[in-house]
Amino acid sequence: MYILDTGARFSAVRFSPVFNPPPTSLRRRYFIVRANLPFPKHQAKYHKELEVAIDAVDRACRLCVDVKRSLFSSKEKIVEKNDQTPVTIADFGVQALVSLELSKLFPSIPLVAEEDSHFVRANNLVSSVVSEVKSKASIGDNHLSDADVLEAIDRGGKDAYTFCNKPATYWVLDPIDGTRGFLKGDEALYVVGLALVVDNEIVLGVMGCPNWPGDSSDGSTGTLMLSHIGCGTWTKKLQNVSGNVAGDWIRCFVDACVLMNKARFCIQESQTWESLPLSGFFDASTVSEDLKHKEILLLPTCCGSLCKYLMVASGRASVFLLRAKTQRTIKSWDHAVGIICVHEAGGKVTDWEGDEINLEEDQSERRLIFPAGGVVVSNGSLHNQILEMISSASPTL
């Protein structure tokens, strides 16, 4: 294992400065959370599942905030997994916490998630993870044992469930998408993402982004985004420093941009604009004030994929382009919740050939997706233009 430098620099989306709450612990203040929905329950077939998902993601975001503070104050270990991606006790704590919350009301629905308990055990992180989970779990869970928490983590692991090539209902969780952003600091984004899939259709999703720019006047920072099939996409502030849920749900939509040179683009931080097919048509600039005729605006948005989906679904960005690399796999949890949030906000998500993302291609595990060429996430209005440009540029790629 390697210890990562928590001071490593990564590019971040340029928002107004985020309010930094005082170091007052948010522990135990989660109890007042109420998963009220912004639409009538009878309109949402999966409203019970959605209410639980909202509450679980909100609790998970509180765990992230506390762990992040303790990481930098106590210099706890940050280890690397075999693929050289960083992982912290927050990743495992979130997975355990969400798994426990979901299993209380929906024990028969399997969970597909990123982590398993191997790294917790191997790096002596068990007691730290258990402590964080106990502090955020539902009332009555303060007697959780180490075995309970480790089992909850492994419930989402690779070997927990086999789908036998049949349509299924299951949760998809990314405990922290953008761990590098979690480690970087206040400007970088990271997301807790949870979706429910029923017979290969994503029917609901909840994303929590603790670093999303908030309102300094009330001490709030972060956002929750929910989507339910047929009910739209909605956002709400996370709890503020006093533990109150700030504000009401607000429905959000993709932007209305119809001109490619006026669009705002996001790309994966590990990829360059020059590696993407649209670079043959437009140059890219990160400076909005002086764009030339053949330039598009590129928004430096770190870290992970889900924050880019959040940008498009909320109308802050027009397009997110991801190129599939032959040497790397694309994980379902990096996209599932983002797909429904963008769809319900009026946008569109396909592979580079215009086909919808198929979550069942990995028939036995549902952990991988195989989008042809890559993923296009757009406001819908620009989608066909982008696909045409990709198609015309493909012989030269």
Swiss-Prot record:
Q: Gene Ontology cellular component?
A: chloroplast; mitochondrion
| Binding residue positions for adenosine 3',5'-bisphosphate | 179, 305, 308, 334
Asked if the record carries the keyword Transmembrane helix, the reply is no
GO MF, any single term:
3'(2'),5'-bisphosphate nucleotidase activity
UniProt binding sites for Mg(2+) 2? 174, 177, 334
Binding positions for Mg(2+) 3 per the UniProt entry: 114
Q: What class of enzyme is it?
A: hydrolase
Keywords, alphabetical: Hydrolase, Magnesium, Metal-binding, Mitochondrion, Transit peptide
- Name the positions where AMP binds: 305, 308, 334
- Residues in the active site? 91, 179
Q: Which locations, inside or outside the cell, does it occupy?
A: Mitochondrion
Cite the binding residues for Mg(2+) 1: 114, 174, 176
Q: What is its EC number?
A: 3.1.3.7
Q: Which cofactor does it need?
A: Mg(2+)
> Pfam families given for it?
Inositol_P
Reaction catalyzed: 3'-phosphoadenylyl sulfate + H2O = adenosine 5'-phosphosulfate + phosphate; adenosine 3',5'-bisphosphate + H2O = AMP + phosphate; adenosine 2',5'-bisphosphate + H2O = AMP + phosphate
What does it do?
Phosphatase that converts adenosine 3'-phosphate 5'-phosphosulfate (PAPS) to adenosine 5'-phosphosulfate (APS) and 3'(2')-phosphoadenosine 5'-phosphate (PAP) to AMP.
Family, according to the entry, reads as follows: Belongs to the inositol monophosphatase superfamily.
Q: What is this protein called?
A: Putative 3'(2'),5'-bisphosphate nucleotidase, mitochondrial
User: What is the taxonomic lineage of the source species?
Assistant: Eukaryota, Viridiplantae, Streptophyta, Embryophyta, Tracheophyta
